[in-house]
């Protein structure tokens, strides 16, 4: 395939053509989503069993083989069971086509919103990068084609790819997440000059494809559809309803500026490695009869080489991964993996190489996700400078877990000379486990009224003593600990289930 050579030689500045299959004459039929040809956006229709998903997979792979990941990247949205997305990203093995910038395979509202925020963030980032490039180059306007030319010429140093957003079976997306679909179409329209291409695939266009989608779809590919009306909707002719064979399709661009009948290429066939020319010793074993005729020949090496090595698709992806790794090529991921449901303090500390400072009580309580800035980081609470803290949450939301993490993270990093906890657990009494910790003065429960009264008398006395002690240090606890030769511990009064305490 010589893909790295192809990546070096092929540039999407003037054309983004990629083989899709063959036409009626047996010539290679190419789809070119450059805005001067068939692009930037389009529709694909085909009933179940028509070969629609295979055509999409073939097109993605064709682009990936021919264009550098810095020139072309993909977001795959797949609700048909994840077949298209899984073809290019195996989350179990970690293998992923180098060109993949993100995949969505379920209709979880939170995940949809997260992805949409990330896509919008990417558009804003591209606008900033293009504005910077305009100032550097002196160009009056910058679009994706001009920017990529500047990058190829070394004027700018950050690659920006054509971003293909491909949605297989968007009818379900539109039905269950209509706002997301509307935002996606709007994003594609706004992002046209920024290198965004939207390809929507459906089984039946009628009632699903609205005027906004039609008006923004320059090319249309129609495989076998169930009814003539569907074919008429797509390509203004009933011919697609009479298609007999899987993978056959009609391609229409604009108002019949280009019209062709073709057969999609197929990349799911078995991959059989071809022999490479080399000098070899003949190890063939021949069986002959009594008069010297060969009755049977066995060549173990040849038979071993002719054995199938899986699908062509997976082998080509493995090859492209290898090429990208050798050249240290990485595509910018538009969103990170979602934060897992269960995380441990120790794992977060290790993951982010977090180190606690002496006398800075800044316990780890979790990890935060910021899709707008395509960022995840460790989440801490600064008890020295943050003032008081209120934790809200319904039953079962994780309040106890948060308090537990806060205490645990604090006492594993700070001794009793730095911090003292006084805990009033009027809830499940889960915080009882900290009773014997040296940093914990006491853990008080709901029926221990006298202990509660004594605690607040003690706290009031400590406040009065510290007011005098800190007088020469601007009345500030942190300033005292920084400038004085003595240190005072931070006092943390924690009330779990404040409603019960208040009553």
Indicate residue ranges for each PLM-predicted region:
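Long, structured protein-protein interaction/assembly regions in large complexes
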Residues: 145-149, 217
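Phosphate-binding and hydrolysis-coupling loops of NTP-dependent motor/remodeling domains
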Residues: 1-34, 101, 209-367
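P-loop NTPase catalytic phosphate-binding loop
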Residues: 4-141, 154-229, 233, 241-242, ...
